[in-house]
Amino acid sequence: TYYDYQMVTNPAALFSENEVLQILEQMFPVKDAELRDTQTLNVAYGFYLNIITGELYKKNYAKAREYLALVSVTTIPAEIYYIHFNLRYLKNLTYYLYTGKMRYYKEVIAVIDMIESFGDVRLAEGMKKEMLQLTAGRTFNLEKGQFPLNIVTEK
């Protein structure tokens, strides 16, 4: 039920790796997903969001990438856009933190802008704040051709 998923999803980042794997095995695929409402599915799939986010805060980017790989083979209904947007945000944030490549940073910003344009300002603001916390003190790893140019001309 909704509350069963909530009891597991909310503290997800606190579980050990073994506990997470056991829970993933039991929770997914969601049984009778087509019979569940959007709220219940958001909470169920939110488990992935919480375990990935927890690893990012621990700076365990390799583990976050492992969890992203697991969720990539999980079928999440298309109408659960909240989860899809969050996973896209977390995937690009993880890869930015892992590689420092500017293209991932730009994609994070694009996802946040998209969410804001859909009217979910609260979620977008939360993502901006989280991104600033997680990227504080980081420098960009600019790829060839992606660095800013200053053209100096004489008058």
Where are these predicted regions, by residue range?
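Structured C-terminal portions of repeat-based eukaryotic scaffold domains
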Residues: 61-75, 81-90
